[in-house]
Amino acid sequence: MRLPVYRVVRFSLFSVLVTTSLAVSAYEGDLKRGRLYFRQICTACHQTVLGKPIPPNERLKADWVGYIKADKHDKTGKSNPSVKYFTTKAYRETIKGSNKAAEKLLNANDAELYADVQAWLQYSAKDSDNPSGCQ
């Protein structure tokens, strides 16, 4: 029994689309690297500048999503106002001499690090299954 040509073509096209969509799936963030970045870089800075850490379990998931979407880190004007800036190579360059994690992650992809930190904040928020502090 021979399959009509259009069925073979349709199946082939479907296979290509499925394979392509799986290969191009969005980067969802690496929890381990997000945890490392937040605890070693973000917390160190918060401790120095504010005198206290800002633990992920201090806010709800929705609060962290709103914070990330607003992209407002420092409203005082004392530092860069963008949240995203603090996961960039430009920022890591400025602290690499005093922060080994920043030096280690110096050439990491900025967008992926940003996603890693977001994933860690969601994973360890107050209303998550794994609320976590800064230790």
Predicted regions and their residues:
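N-terminal secretory signal peptides that target proteins for export/translocation
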Residues: M1-R7
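Bacterial N-terminal signal peptides
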Residues: F11-T20
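Electrostatic cytochrome c docking/interface patches
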Residues: L22-Y37, K52-P53
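The canonical Cys-X-X-Cys-His
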Residues: F38-V49, V117
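Detector for the c-type heme attachment site
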Residues: A44-G51, K69, Q122
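Short cysteine/histidine-rich zinc-coordinating motifs and their immediately flanking basic loops
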Residues: I54-K61
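Short Fe-S-cluster ligation motifs
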Residues: K69-A101, L105
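C-terminal capping alpha-helices of c-type cytochrome domains
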Residues: E93-Q135
